[in-house]
Amino acid sequence: MADDTTDTKSSNQMWGGRFASGPDAIMEEINASIGFDKKLFAQDIRGSIAHATMLAHQEIISAEDKDKIVHGLNTILSEIESGNFEFSRQLEDIHMNVEARLATLIGPAAGRLHTARSRNDQVALDFRLWVKEELQKTEQMLTGLIAAFLDRAEEHAESVMPGFTHLQTAQPVTFGHHCMAYVEMFGRDRSRVRHAIEHLDESPIGAAALAGTGYPIDRHMTAKALGFREPTRNSIDTVSDRDFAIEFLSIAAIAGMHLSRLAEEIVIWSTPQFGFVRLSDAFSTGSSIMPQKKNPDAAELVRAKTGRINGSLVALLTIMKGLPLAYSKDMQEDKEQVFDAAESLELAIAAMTGMVRDMTVNTARMKAAAGSGYSTATDLADWLVREAGLPFRDAHHVTGRAVALAESKGCDLAELPLSDLQAIHADITDKVYDVLTVEASVASRKSFGGTAPSEVRRQIAFWRARN
């Protein structure tokens, strides 16, 4: 598709009745948005068909003109989809490009399409439709990512790994439990997507420039035809509103943050020093100089995409923060932020779904690491509370002394002789060794939401029923 043509017709002929001369070339360049808003062509045509149909139903235009308009719009849709439509920068935007082509195809009837409509409510409609469709796509992609994690969680409900705080070994958990943490995160993202769809499910068309219209239009009819729950309730707010776009970017930023945290863990886990996972060749690259390298570039790029998404959110918030009601041309700068963030988010979710699905998990390496760093120290403290009757703070102190002794001897807690433990606290018996293995530690964490395999499987069943 060409971005520009050499025609001399411009949008000035659409709106320039009170102007004595045409715009400067620089004005045309800064004013034009067709380079990016042509992405809205399907939504623009769909909205125009619904509008024309309503106008005819209300006898504002004739049925004959409506039929010409609808046929012409469908012809334009086919031309754009097949790559046979020439977009003109002189015509500013997608609305004027479509209308100019419609006039060429069907003549004067094309001029009736814009009855009871402004580009202000037209672009609000097009953009809202596009964002709604993108949210629906995001919901489906998040569902796929959640499914990939559920499969890995089920596979590894009993696979022990170290749990971390401050990136230091904390307590043993299962890899399945760790996977389910991401299910919860991406489940919240999906819930936010669903709420956002609910928030924007109102049709802007019919608000006109800002005050509504004197024509007897039926906004409920167009809302229903376009798949909206109802029309918007205030015409000024309708053309002023870009909350739906900001909400999309907010959701994208939060989801991107979750993806970035996951990407960071994958990058760390795939290092030889950790060796917890091995990424498939399909989601790795090599080095141009070091033949041995297998780089987690997909994960690193997912991590980087988050920065772009965050930038888009801040950009649109900044664009909107000082605008008086109703429409201002500043709002033309809304779309590129959303388009770019949507593309980044789609790529990131797709890449992460593939990585999670295809990566190889080194359970032996994880289990070995789970026992390092005195990860069962909390289990010793809990045993002292249960079996020796110590207050937890006292048990914490006793356990700290045991850890210090083990460190000085270069051994694990379970390797300390009973005599050494009894020298720290006389009530310790040989039964304490039953809780000092990583398997026993994990199995004991049966509290709701805990890491015990039985609890992980309950969590998986809960999410399977909702995915």
From Swiss-Prot:
Q: The organism sits in which domain of life?
A: Bacteria
Among Pfam families, the record links this protein to: ASL_C2, Lyase_1
Q: Which GO terms describe its molecular function?
A: argininosuccinate lyase activity
Could you tell me the EC number(s) of this protein? Answer: 4.3.2.1
The reaction(s) catalysed by this protein are: 2-(N(omega)-L-arginino)succinate = fumarate + L-arginine
User: What keywords is this UniProt entry annotated with?
Assistant: Amino-acid biosynthesis, Arginine biosynthesis, Cytoplasm, Lyase
A GO biological process this protein is involved in? arginine biosynthetic process via ornithine
Q: What class of enzyme is it?
A: lyase
Q: Where is this protein localized, as stated in its record?
A: Cytoplasm
The cross-references to InterPro entries, in alphabetical order and at most eight, read:
Arg_succ_lyase_C, Argininosuccinate_lyase, Fumarase/histidase_N, Fumarate_lyase_CS, Fumarate_lyase_fam, Fumarate_lyase_N, L-Aspartase-like
Its principal location?
cytoplasm
Q: In which pathway does it act?
A: Amino-acid biosynthesis; L-arginine biosynthesis; L-arginine from L-ornithine and carbamoyl phosphate: step 3/3
CDD domains (UniProt xref): Argininosuccinate_lyase (cd01359)
Recorded GO cellular component terms are: cytosol
Q: Which family does it belong to?
A: Belongs to the lyase 1 family. Argininosuccinate lyase subfamily.
Q: Which PANTHER family match?
A: ARGININOSUCCINATE LYASE (PTHR43814:SF1)
Instruction: Please name the NCBIfam families in this protein's record.
Output: argH
Q: What is this protein called?
A: Argininosuccinate lyase
Q: Which organism is it from?
A: Rhizobium johnstonii (strain DSM 114642 / LMG 32736 / 3841) (Rhizobium leguminosarum bv. viciae)
